[in-house]
Amino acid sequence: YKIRRGKLNHIFISHLHGDHYFGLIGLISSMALLNREQPLHLFAPPGLEEIIALQLKVASTTLPYELVFHPLNKEEVILDTPKFSVETFHTQHRIPCWGFLIKEKKLPRKLDKEKAINLNIPAAFYSSLKMGYDYTAKDGSVVYNKQVTLPNSPAKSYVYCADTIYDERLINIAKN
């Protein structure tokens, strides 16, 4: 996916079968060798912290950055950023297993800069226009947001659910 390791700040593990986390210790160690400094957040079922701690201990490895473990215990929003959110849901597997619904937040409107300039709207108000606000000039005249902006692309979402049997409930989670 061509994501630079330095930009990877959150990792989501669905369950504790080896094919879903065995490569994690290698990634964590590689990040240490590359002098990572910012914390790495791991969202996983309880137990992963002990597994990683044992692997680091046996290898006599001290990380130059913090591992922050977030145990998955219930269906909830586990991460909420200005750009996206992540929520968990149970899936049907032999051991506790989680799916993840990643939802992009509503994108700001697109500004037609040429129209804004022609209507003498100062650049300082452009971000407000993108957020949906109208502009009121000093003389009291109003330029409505829709006069100088266009809707952005609809927000996207992505559902990750691995190693699960057929479950009607997942259809509703994955809709839209």
What are these regions (language model features)?
Residues Y1-F43, P71:
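Active-site metal-binding motif and surrounding structural segment of the metallo-beta-lactamase
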Residues P82-I173:
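Active-site-proximal loop/helix segment associated with metal-binding centers of metalloenzymes
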